Curated annotation (Swiss-Prot):
This is Protein FYV8. Residues 1-11 have a biased composition (Basic residues). Belongs to the FYV8 family. Residues 110-120, 564-574, 585-596 have a biased composition (Low complexity). The gene is FYV8. Residues 187-205, 413-424, 575-584 have a biased composition (Polar residues).
Length: 751
């Protein structure tokens, strides 16, 4: 699966541009946020924009004006064909890199060195390229499609000064900025032999070997390790630019010993003479805030020329027991966004060369906003160098193209995390090492820079995520809330046990025996009038779905009306109550025992006093003396405005108002007394209405014919009667004559 993904990514731009453009230099060196934070860097990136595909329309005005540069603006495909046909060692001055020149470039580059240093640099370059091309074996005559990210070439070994061109486009017309002709000619001459040597190396299918200052072959973090992981097997040479580039990068280990002897030629007298000037130029770069590599594009080969001090290993990979230079991607949202988009950070870190005398300190990573690190990090003396292991095809499972999520495996000392880029143009998975939890001096020498992702573990983890919403364990349906006011609360035992189907798996046999049976109906008993406490009748009234009988309806006013809210009764109320009680008792004993609401007693002509009820509302006669006394009592009144505006003292006004409040509280309008007398009356309210109702003749006839009136003459009753009659006729006929006679009789009938 990783092989297919790599092939598809390597052929992206070829399919889009039909082979005329391989997608090199599509990613710019800096992101938008870094350019906004640094105006100097924003000015530099104007000339560093990626080279776009061009039609084969010939050279520009600038190239036609220059002699010997007519072939410089040929399309990329034509340049690759010429490089393939020229073979190794074929280098002509016509194919030189036209570097744009500007006033800012003249200030930044200290190219005032003598022609002696430039010529010595060219001689050393020619010698190095010839020896490398002779030692390399031909990998194929077919020009490969160069991948977007190339490994930086360390020119410290051959004494190359840190030249940083300002752009990639060969046809950039920036000659009018005011640079002197001597600086421009020396700059173009310095890249002449380098361009053709790289073109010859690319045409023969070889790659520039990388070597560390201390003799160990190490690759820059991120980009080269990813390229080695993508294609380390020689049998994929025909699958595109990825495999061919991987074979070139694997030649580093084979030629490490051969390149070691070239180190003696790099420290010549000519190179050491020009070293202080180059160091001064590098210091000027740091003062201007210009950090990062410059790329020279020549015939599809992307060469990264660093400063005078070119890095072999990024400082963030030099994780020791005392220093930790790895980025933490959980600091802020801005760091996360730049961690996904700015892949160029691996090349933007640098360390001092062994040629520099002051090797005790080095500049660490530049900050995410484009400013250098706050303080230099000291080097550890006992740990000279950390060699990064070359990852082979066995670790190809670490390249996961997961876009939505990523998985992390934690060890005792190292935690690795895979960050997936959000940029649609790169689609590459970058791996970074997060800060170690506990550093061990014995094991801090090796740093794991990739994540082995196992497919089975990922599937198990995804299955667990899918089942979390189903098997939560603690969730149970809310059955108690649906019962409402009709059901009682569940017993404590059943509540603790929960649902029968969701019991704990760790329950022992004894607990299962003590568990309450699941089919018990004790919790599902329907109660029409639940007993819930002190105000049980009020709770039953609030439940509108309960069917009440007459006694419950009659008891409701008695509960609502409290005796404490009733005003004090008149003094003669006790005598009236005793007289009424005696009359009620005599009438109830002489009655027939039937209620006044019974229709049968009314029809029979029996009229008796009803049974005594304390809460029936009766409108009988009341004692006129007491009522007249209550009604005739004057309502206390006081002119409050005149009292307040009067000349009396404040204390007198306050006493007058307090006495008025007491009079109002003591006054009674008699309404409560009327209600109390009506409830205590001995006469039934039904007798008052029945005296004029039952004398009508049609009412008596209706009660006499109650049975006939009770029958319902509806469609349902009519249908049922007809069906019953038909059933009697049909089945009686079939039982007498048999089935044959029934059918024959039906056929003879006429409609």
């Amino acid at each position: 699966m990783p092989d297919k993904v790599n092939r598809r990514k390597s052929q992206r731009w070829v399919s889009v541009s039909k082979g005329n453009y391989d997608g090199a230099d599509w990613d710019s060196d800096y992101s938008g946020e870094e350019l906004e934070s640094s105006p100097t860097r924003q000015h530099e990136t104007i000339c560093k924009l990626p080279e776009l595909p061009k039609l084969n329309l010939g050279g520009s005005t600038e190239e036609r004006g220059r002699p010997g540069s007519g072939d410089g603006l040929a399309p990329r495909g034509a340049a690759e064909e010429e490089a393939a046909s020229s073979g190794r060692g074929a280098a002509t001055p016509a194919h030189e890199v036209q570097t744009p020149r500007s006033g800012a470039a003249a200030q930044k580059f200290s190219l005032t060195s003598s022609s002696r240093s430039v010529s010595s640099m060219n001689k050393e370059l020619d010698t190095l390229m010839d020896e490398i091309s002779k030692e390399m074996t031909a990998g194929g005559s077919e020009p490969p499609l160069v991948e977007t990210r190339q490994s930086p070439v360390d020119f410290n070994r051959v004494g190359v000064p840190a030249l940083k061109p300002e752009g990639h486009l060969a046809d950039d017309s920036s000659d009018s900025d005011g640079e002197d002709a001597a600086g421009g000619s020396s700059l173009s001459q310095s890249f002449e032999h380098l361009n053709m040597s790289l073109k010859t190396d690319t045409a023969s299918g070889q790659a520039m070997p990388l070597s560390s200052p201390r003799g160990s072959s190490a690759l820059p973090a991120g980009r080269d390790s990813l390229a080695l992981k993508k294609g380390a097997s020689p049998d994929r040479a025909s699958e595109g630019s990825l495999s061919s580039r991987s074979e070139d990068l694997l030649a580093v280990d084979r030629t490490a010993g051969e390149n070691t002897r070239l180190k003696t030629t790099n420290s010549s007298d000519d190179d050491t003479d020009s070293l202080p000037e180059l160091i001064t130029s590098d210091a000027k770069f740091r003062a201007d805030g210009a950090s990062g590599p410059a790329r020279v594009v020549s015939s599809g080969v992307e060469t990264v020329i660093h400063r005078a001090i070119a890095p072999e290993v990024a400082p963030r990979l030099r994780i020791t027991s005392k220093t930790d230079l790895s980025y933490r991607y959980d600091t802020s949202s801005e760091d996360d966004s730049e961690a996904y988009s700015g892949i160029e950070d691996d090349y933007l870190s640098y360390q001092p060369s062994p040629n520099i005398s002051d090797a005790a300190t080095f500049h660490g990573h530049r900050s995410r906003t484009g400013s250098p690190a706050r303080a230099p990090h000291p080097l550890v003396e006992q740990e000279e160098h950390i060699e990064l292991p070359v990852i082979s095809d066995d670790d190809s499972t670490s390249k996961s193209s997961v876009r939505d999520n990523y998985y992390s495996e934690e060890s005792d000392n190292t935690t690795s995390q895979a960050l997936v880029t959000q940029d649609n143009s790169s689609h590459d998975t970058i791996h970074d090492t997060i800060r170690e939890r506990s550093f061990d001096k014995s094991t801090s020498g090796s740093v794991t820079h990739s994540i082995p992702v196992i497919k089975d573990d990922n599937e198990d983890w995804q299955n667990q995520l899918r089942q979390q919403s189903v098997h939560l364990g603690a969730w149970n349906p809310d059955t108690e809330g649906k019962r409402g006011a009709f059901l009682t609360q569940a017993s404590p035992m059943s509540t603790n046990k929960g649902m029968c189907g969701s019991q704990d798996e760790e329950t022992t046999g004894d607990d299962q025996q003590l568990a309450e049976p699941c089919n018990d109906d004790s919790d599902s008993v329907w109660e029409g009038f639940p007993s819930v406490g002190e105000y049980e009748d009020l709770q039953s009234v609030a439940d509108i779905k309960t069917i009440y009988d007459n006694q419950t309806l009659y008891n409701v006013p008695g509960i609502i009306t409290s005796s404490t809210s009733v005003p004090p009764l008149p003094s003669s109320m006790s005598e009236l109550t005793s007289r009424q009680d005696t009359s009620i008792l005599s009438e109830s004993t002489s009655g027939s025992g039937l209620d006044s609401d019974s229709l049968m007693r009314v029809v029979e002509g029996q009229r008796h006093a009803p049974k005594p009820s304390m809460f029936k509302e009766n409108f009988g006669q009341t004692p006129e003396v007491q009522v007249e006394h209550l009604v005739n009592s004057p309502v206390p009144s006081l002119d409050i405005c005149a009292l307040i505006e009067g000349p009396q003292s404040h204390s007198f006004k306050r006493d007058k108002l307090n006495s008025h409040i007491e009079d109002l509280n003591a006054y009674s309008s008699g309404a409560q007394t009327w209600i109390k007398y009506a409830l205590k009356s001995t006469q039934s309210s039904s007798n008052i209405t029945f005296d004029e109702y039952v004398i009508s003749k049609h009412v008596q006839d209706a009660y006499a014919q109650a049975e006939e009136v009770s029958k319902k003459h509806s469609v349902t009753n009519a249908v049922n009667q007809n069906v019953s009659q038909l059933r009697k006729k049909v089945f009686s006929h079939s039982m007498k004559e048999g089935a044959k006679g029934l059918l024959s009789s039906i056929g003879k009938k006429k409609l």
